[in-house]
From Swiss-Prot:
This is 3-keto-steroid reductase. It comes from Candida glabrata (strain ATCC 2001 / BCRC 20586 / JCM 3761 / NBRC 0622 / NRRL Y-65 / CBS 138). Gene3D superfamilies: NAD(P)-binding Rossmann-like Domain (3.40.50.720). One of its GO terms (cellular component) is mitochondrial outer membrane. Belongs to the short-chain dehydrogenases/reductases (SDR) family. ERG27 subfamily.
Length: 348
């Protein structure tokens, strides 16, 4: 009996709708002779257990699936000691890593401006559910590490971890996938405020930083045998705003999503499974020596819901500034984190 090919995939934010569907699609794309270890990350152990059970149920529905093992990281990307502990765990357990999905999507939301929402929906319903201006975000929120919280959660924390595990990624000829957004417009980021301390659009701004960081680093990553891509999942139902919606507003949101797609919006995937198309596409289907890395790969859907991949160009203005800022901060934290590793492992 021949041994199975072992692969390791790390999925950050695996307990989200998108993260869970990335796991599903990644499993589907593996042949039966693969033994895939899924390393799911979350801030809490109960969420890890919940995700693992859901993935196990999915595997049970598949015909001739690959073998799937489970591991986990308890990591809070807004806590650099926690990030360092995650590195320590990965470094101790894995010689090579084949996939790394950066699905960090933290925001500092403060509800919905309902008057603004009604006005935008009435004046431009398609724009209202593509680039909403009525989501209220807090300004000036910092982490305990004194960084812009959303910047640290969505950009710097994951980047720092990736830099620490470069040997494992290189040995695994890994694909690194950064999840960006269709809302990552250059107007949402000031290069004088890269941590977005003064910004009221920190989520969108953080995804713009992701775009620029990718453009500034993918060639250097490729020189180490690591193929890095940036993708966006389009518009889909997520859990981040559920607490601000009731039954009627949720129904209204879904109605507008389907209406937008009917009117020709290719980005309204609605379903988390379709949203996960682009992340897994770049990780498993493309020829890394042919596909372009300087563009953003997007999950798209036709009017009747047929999924496909659409690429968009990325404005590279500011990419060198972003890299210089983040590299300087990385050196600062290398010094701060000396002798800071602790053990957070608990059996699942």
């Amino acid at each position: 009996m021949t041994s199975k090919t072992r692969k390791v995939a790390v999925i950050t934010g695996a307990n989200s709708n998108l993260g869970l569907n990335i796991a599903y699609r990644l499993i589907e794309r593996q042949s039966a002779d693969v033994r895939l270890t899924l390393v799911v990350t979350s801030r809490t152990l109960p969420r890890v257990r919940e995700v693992v059970e859901l993935i196990k149920k999915f595997v049970a529905t598949q015909e001739d699936p690959c073998s799937v093992d489970f591991d986990y990281l308890l990591v809070d990307f807004t806590n650099m000691v926690s990030v360092l502990n995650a590195y320590y765990d990965l470094n101790q357990k894995y010689e090579s890593i084949n996939y790394f999905f950066v699905n960090a999507a933290q925001g500092v939301y403060d509800g919905i401006d309902w008057i603004g929402a009604v006005k935008q929906v009435l004046s431009d319903p398609l724009e209202a559910v593509t680039n909403p201006t009525y989501r209220k975000q807090l300004v000036g929120v910092k982490s305990k590490d004194e960084m812009g919280l959303v910047f640290q959660a969505n950009v710097f924390g994951p980047y720092y971890l990736i830099q620490k595990i470069l040997p494992q990624l290189s040995k695994g000829k890994a694909t690194v996938v950064w999840i960006s957004s269709i809302m990552a417009d250059p107007k949402h980021l000031s290069l004088q405020d890269i941590e977005m301390i003064k910004s009221d659009v920190t989520y969108e701004g953080s995804k713009r930083v992701v775009d620029l960081l990718h453009l500034a680093t993918y060639k250097q990553m490729k020189s180490q045998g690591i193929h890095q891509y940036v993708v966006q999942p389009g518009i889909f139902t997520s859990y981040s705003f559920a607490k601000y919606l009731n039954f009627f507003t949720t129904f209204g949101m879904l109605f507008l999503f389907y209406l937008a797609r009917l009117l020709g919006s290719k980005w309204h995937n609605i379903d988390g499974y379709k949203a996960a198309n682009a992340p897994v596409y770049v990780a498993t289907l493309i020829n890394p020596h042919f596909e372009h890395q300087e563009v953003k790969y997007g999950s798209a859907s036709s009017r009747d819901g047929m999924e496909y991949i659409e690429t968009t160009d990325i404005d590279k203005t500011g990419s060198s500034d972003v890299l210089a800022y983040i590299e300087k901060k990385k050196l600062e934290w290398d010094d701060k984190l000396k002798d800071q590793i602790t053990n957070s492992r608990i059996p699942i």
